[in-house]
From Swiss-Prot:
Annotated InterPro entries: Dehydrin, Dehydrin_CS
A GO cellular-component term linked to this record: membrane
Biased composition (Basic and acidic residues): 11-25, 46-80, 109-124, 148-158
The protein's role, per its UniProt record: Phosphorylation of ECCP44 protein is thought to be involved in the acquisition of embryogenic competence. Unlike other dehydrins, it is not thought to function as an environmental stress tolerant.
Organism of derivation: Daucus carota (Wild carrot)
GO BP: cold acclimation; response to abscisic acid; response to water deprivation
Protein name: Phosphoprotein ECPP44
């Protein structure tokens, strides 16, 4: 029985050894694969680093400046923050405590305090202006005497009273040929000239009468000249006949024959 038990024990040990040796081989192969992948990855990274260009010094400076600007808050942002903080502090805040509302005291900002001080200074500097009525000027000795004289006070009153405005000149109706409402440019200019008086209907009638009388006189003068001419001609002929006896014979014969 003892020999039988020993045989299977040896067989079991052998199987375990083979299994362990097989596993060791597979594990070794797996490790080698891992090492190969690591080597390939490192080579690829080195190639990529070599192919990429090195960053320039100027580009680095620009990037640093932009980062600094972004980090530093601008003046407008600071003012906006200060204004928002002052407004939030000055605003009324209501807090409920046990169902009751209580208002916190207003915290005034710097701007409001400065404005209040300025207003106070302006109020202090403003001086109340008093309206002073000027007393009447002192009258001289002569003026007092004139007032006491009869008629002196009336003159003063007359001087103070303003004279009435002059009456408006009445519009002059001008008789114009054709439509009386329509006037020519020359007539309007003549009306504006000082000392010009537009012609009325009576003046025009007088002019017509004067023209007619002048025509009659001219006609009378023409007739008088005609008579004078004939008379002078006849007188001349008579004188010629008186002083020229040669013409007497034919005239006498002409008279007797007739």
């Amino acid at each position: 029985m003892a020999s039988d038990d020993s045989v299977p024990q040896h067989s079991v040990e052998k199987t375990t050894e083979y299994e362990s040796s097989d596993r060791g081989l597979f594990d070794f192969m797996k490790k080698e694969e891992k090492d190969e992948t690591k080597v390939i990855a490192t080579e690829f990274e080195e190639k990529v680093q070599v192919s990429e260009p090195e960053p320039k010094y100027e580009d680095c400076k620009v990037v640093e400046e932009e980062e600094e600007k972004a980090a530093k808050p601008s003046l407008l942002e600071k003012l906006h923050r200060s204004g928002s903080s002052s407004s939030s502090s000055s605003s009324d805040e209501e807090v409920e405590e046990g169902g009751e509302k209580k208002k916190k005291k207003e915290k005034k900002g710097l701007k409001e305090k400065i404005e209040e001080k300025i207003h106070h200074k302006e109020e202090d500097t403003s001086v109340p202006v008093e309206v002073v009525t000027e007393p009447e000027k002192k009258k001289g000795f002569m003026e007092k005497i004139k007032e006491k004289l009869p008629g002196g006070g009336k003159k003063v009153e007359e001087e103070t009273v303003a004279p009435p405005p002059p009456p408006a000149a009445a519009p002059v109706d001008c008789a114009v040929e054709g439509d009386p409402a329509k006037k020519g440019i020359l007539e309007k200019i003549k009306e504006k000239i000082p000392g010009y008086h537009p012609k009325t209907s009576t003046e025009e009638e007088k002019k017509d009468n004067d023209c007619a009388s002048a025509k009659l006189i001219i006609r009378c003068l023409d007739r008088m000249f005609d008579y004078y001419y004939y008379a002078s001609f006849s007188c001349g002929v008579g004188l010629i006949l008186c002083f020229d006896p040669l013409l007497w014979g034919p005239l006498i014969s002409f008279g007797t024959s007739g």
